[in-house]
Design a protein with these regions (language model features):
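ABC-family P-loop ATPase nucleotide-binding domain
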Residues: 1-28, 239-244
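H-loop (His-switch) and adjacent beta-strand-loop-beta switch element
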Residues: 229-241
Length: 244
């Protein structure tokens, strides 16, 4: 897929460091015949290399926003631009390929295959992208070493702690060398010690590799570790602050 597709439009005045732009983005769901507006005219940029937290109470629209940023769902209104390209102009197949190439995901429930080892779980996205067995094994092994799980590559998820499972999930997200990693409540199922460990590990990967991280949280303690924090309330951005 070429992103020089003639149907793709490009917004003007995009700073060189801007990776993602949301322009008056809204998301509406139908509850029976009743429309529910989960997000209202969201407008903000995500810059390359940022470590950004979207925070707020349950029901504020955080997960809905992450699904839009991760290009899993399309906005009801507005436009999303990734590296200057309007994602709404891509076909479903083009969007799937683009998302697979550029975005990694970390889930609060880990989403690991229980019958596969840690190594096999990390190899999965590489196989999907057509990476051969030997190369996939080498890259997955290195990814697990990077998150401190070299001794557990053959362990299945049920033999790992919650923190270890989330480290496998981080390795799986990073093994495809994405430009953006989306993490929806990555510490929700972890205790305070493991929560800070996971955020510190994500931060380390962000700094070492220059990968952009966007994660959601309702835990204010984690906000001290970020470059920027965006408060979402009732589907609207209430505050957008850079940290010292």
């Amino acid at each position: 897929m070429s992103l020089s597709h003639p149907r793709v439009s490009v917004p003007t005045q995009r700073p060189a460091s801007t990776l993602l732009q949301l322009r008056e983005v809204g998301r509406r769901f139908m509850l029976g015949e009743t429309p529910i507006d989960a997000l209202h005219a969201i407008r903000f940029d995500i810059h390359a290399g940022e470590f950004l937290a979207v925070w707020g109470p349950s029901g504020s629209g955080k997960s809905t926003l992450m699904n839009l940023i991760g290009l899993i769902d399309a906005p009801t209104t507005g436009e999303i631009y990734f590296d200057g390209h309007c994602t709404g102009d891509l076909s479903d197949d083009e969007l799937t390929a683009f998302r697979g190439k550029n975005i990694g995901f970390i889930f609060q429930g880990f989403n690991l295959m229980p019958v596969l080892s840690a190594l096999e779980n990390v190899m999965l996205p590489l196989h999907i992208r057509g990476v051969g067995g030997r190369e996939a094994r080498t890259r997955a092994t290195a990814a697990l070493q990077d998150v401190g799980l070299a001794k557990f590559i053959h362990s299945r998820p049920d033999k790992l702690s919650g923190g270890q499972r989330q480290r496998v999930a981080i390795a799986r997200a990073l093994v495809v060398e994405p430009r953006l990693v989306i993490a929806d409540e990555p510490t929700a199922n972890l205790d305070s010690h493991n929560s800070l460990m996971i955020i510190d590990m994500m931060r380390e990967m962000n700094r070492a590799r220059g990968v952009t991280f966007v994660f959601t949280t309702h835990d204010p303690r984690l906000l001290a570790h970020v470059d920027r924090k965006v408060l979402l309330q009732d589907g609207c951005i209430e505050r957008d602050e850079s940290t010292p």
